[in-house]
Regions:
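Donor nucleotide-sugar binding/catalytic pocket of nucleotide-sugar-dependent glycosyltransferases
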Residues: 39, 56-58, 138-187
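Short alpha-helical donor nucleotide-sugar binding micro-motif in glycosyltransferases
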Residues: 82, 259-260, 267-272, 363
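Short acidic/histidine- and often glycine-rich active-site loop of Leloir-type glycosyltransferases
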Residues: 124, 172, 289, 303-318
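Conserved donor-binding/catalytic core segment of Leloir-type glycosyltransferases
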Residues: 197-214, 220-224
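Nucleotide-activated donor-binding/catalytic signature segment of Leloir-type glycosyltransferases, i.e.
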Residues: 244-264
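Aromatic "clamp/platform" in nucleotide-sugar-dependent glycosyltransferases that forms part
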Residues: 280
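Short hydrophobic beta-strand element within catalytic cores of glycosyltransferases
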Residues: 297-300
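Conserved acidic donor-binding segment of nucleotide-sugar-dependent glycosyltransferases
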Residues: 312, 316-324, 332-337
Length: 376
């Protein structure tokens, strides 16, 4: 099967959508399918002409997020491309101008297309004090996904939410986690020593974008409460983003490791003892699965990946937006090394079945079953 994947974010950009889409592309290729990626050009990385089969279009920087871009409309170019080499199916991963162009092109050429719902833009609007536009955002997303035959989502919770908001043909496609990469075996005493920690001291970690919408003030308050009980604790931040400079200047005792990839990222996860994920606005939250696969107990709110996979045997799942309970759970787990130790194995076991090959096989089956004219 020849598949075109359209996305406005892709590695080397680091975010949940980029890494998820790249994983799906790898899985399709491993299954013998041909994959064409259509995405914005990434200045400083992409060469002229493209060094692989990717089809690159013009993009623009996203305000306040250096390093991230959205693709400009490119319907005519995409139609020309697909007329010369028609894909059997199209997957549109992002809802920007490029994704919209791709759905229009697929409709015009009667190529079956499905879409992915990866980001809760409606929640972002509320967070930035623009709650009044939430109905407009949802209306746009409903129209966008209404042009695809199916909309793929990572959790049953999100599927129910979208159906309740009038989205049609929503289908579950669970997320995978690479348990060969993310593993307790990556734990590194050398790395912990670089953090100023031996095995008997506590490393609290956060992995993800360092941005206002991630609710990071709660993570800071939770750590300060931990620190009041355990003077030996250190807080390690893995990632980057617009809030990093301010966070770093106000908290000089925190350790900022910057962006990490591959085995280095896996070592950072596995070398931690407790993972804090305070975000309230994730569509899923891949980092929770990666922490669990690495054998690190997590504290996260009860939605997305945490609702699907986290339990009290391997961390703490907290009632949505209950900040006091989040802090209390973080302190409880930080204080009790003996209780945390068995959680490492149980957290790993809880996600062991989320093998990328199974998820990608399901994805290929969805794409192969798409029929033009079957969208509502």
């Amino acid at each position: 099967m020849r598949v075109a994947i359209v996305t406005e974010t892709y590695p080397p950009e680091i975010n949940g959508v980029a890494l998820t889409v790249a994983g799906l592309a790898r899985g399709l290729k491993a299954g013998g399918h041909t994959v064409q990626i259509i995405r914005p050009r990434q200045p400083g990385f992409d060469k002229e002409p493209a060094q692989n089969d990717d089809f690159l279009v013009r993009g623009m920087r996203i305000p306040r997020y250096p390093g991230l871009r959205f693709g400009l409309p490119a319907r005519r170019k995409i139609e020309t491309l697909w007329k010369s080499g028609r894909p059997d199916a199209v997957y549109v991963a992002t809802e920007g101008p490029l994704g919209s162009s791709a759905l229009q092109a697929a409709q015009a050429l009667r190529i079956p297309a499905c879409s992915g719902f990866h980001t809760r833009f409606d929640e972002f609007a509320r967070y930035y004090g623009l709650g009044w536009i939430t109905p407009l955002v949802l209306a746009y997303l409903r129209r966008f996904h209404g042009r695809s035959i199916k909309t793929l989502v990572p959790t049953s919770e999100l599927a129910d939410f979208l159906r309740d908001k009038g989205f049609d043909n929503v289908e579950l496609l669970r997320r995978a986690v690479d348990t060969r990469l993310f593993s307790p075996e990556r734990r590194s005493l050398k790395l912990r020593r670089e953090w100023g920690l031996g095995e008997d001291r506590l490393a609290v970690i956060y992995v993800g974008r360092i941005a206002a919408e991630k609710n990071l003030d709660l993570a800071v308050r939770a750590f300060r409460a931990i620190q009041a009980q355990r003077k030996d604790a250190r807080f390690v931040w893995v990632g980057d983003g617009p809030a990093r400079a301010g966070l770093q200047s106000h908290n000089p005792d925190f350790i900022f490791s910057g962006m990490q990839r591959g085995e280095a990222l896996a070592a950072h996860y596995a070398s931690g003892d407790l993972f804090l994920f305070p975000s309230l606005h994730e569509t899923f939250g891949n980092v929770t699965l990666e922490a669990m696969a690495s054998g690190v107990p997590a504290v996260a709110f009860d939605y997305g990946a945490a609702r699907e996979h986290l339990c009290d045997a391997c961390g703490r799942r907290i009632a949505y937006n209950d900040e006091a309970a989040f802090i209390a759970a973080a302190v409880e787990l930080a204080r009790d090394d003996a209780a945390r130790h068995p959680m490492r194995t149980l957290a790993r076991n809880a996600v062991a079945a989320l093998d990328p090959s199974h998820v990608c096989a399901n994805f290929a089956a969805v794409l192969g079953g798409l029929k033009v004219g079957s969208a509502a």
